Regions:
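Acyltransferase
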Residues: 149-173
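Short, surface-exposed beta-strand/loop micro-motifs that present aromatic residues
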Residues: 136-143
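Pocket-forming structural segment of enzyme catalytic cores
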Residues: 58-134
């Protein structure tokens, strides 16, 4: 992706599968961190999915401490392992809406698909939706025009498609 296309976009999606340090290193290598920050500062909506949500935080603790994009205060930490809930967290979990946002309408009690070993430890005012997985995992977070979904909406059937449609509605297109 080049700078002009990103800055001209009506919305941005940071997808994700992989590791926090690798993702941030690749964004830096491509010169995209500053461009993404500039686009968000100009009001372009940003949706981070899975790892894309995790790197919205200030730092991650996967393998090593790594600076994130810093859009949402907090740290990405390992999910504590337990006998009842294995890590990685893979599968369907029900959502609990904690506060309304443009993406959360109709999500309370709905099941979505997760694949992750880390969670975003962020202040409560940025947590829109949670899922119970031995701990209360932030499933959706947001601050201003920056949104994150820890689960994979693209793998979550009609519920997930609805979230993506709502995000598209936030974009200028």
């Amino acid at each position: 992706a080049d700078k002009e296309k990103i800055l001209a976009a009506d919305g941005l999606i940071l997808p994700g599968v992989g590791a926090y340090p690798t993702a941030m290193a690749e964004l830096e290598r491509r010169g995209l961190v500053a461009v993404i920050k500039e686009a968000v500062a100009q009001g372009v909506p940003l949706l981070g999915i899975c790892l894309g949500m995790q790197i919205l935080t200030e730092k991650g603790l996967e393998h090593e401490e790594t600076d994130g994009l810093g859009f949402i205060p907090g740290v990405c930490r390992p999910i504590p392992a337990s006998k009842e809930q294995p890590v990685p967290h893979m599968g369907w979990n029900d959502l609990a809406v904690k506060q309304a946002s443009p993406l959360t309408d109709g999500l309370d009690g709905q099941a979505v698909y997760f694949v992750h070993s880390y969670f975003t430890d962020v202040p409560i005012q940025y947590i829109d939706v949670t899922a119970d997985y031995s701990i209360e995992v932030p499933a959706m977070i947001h601050k201003d025009n920056v949104y994150g979904a820890q689960f994979h909406p693209e793998k979550s059937g009609d519920i997930g498609l609805g979230i993506l449609e709502k995000f598209a509605g936030l974009c200028k297109a």
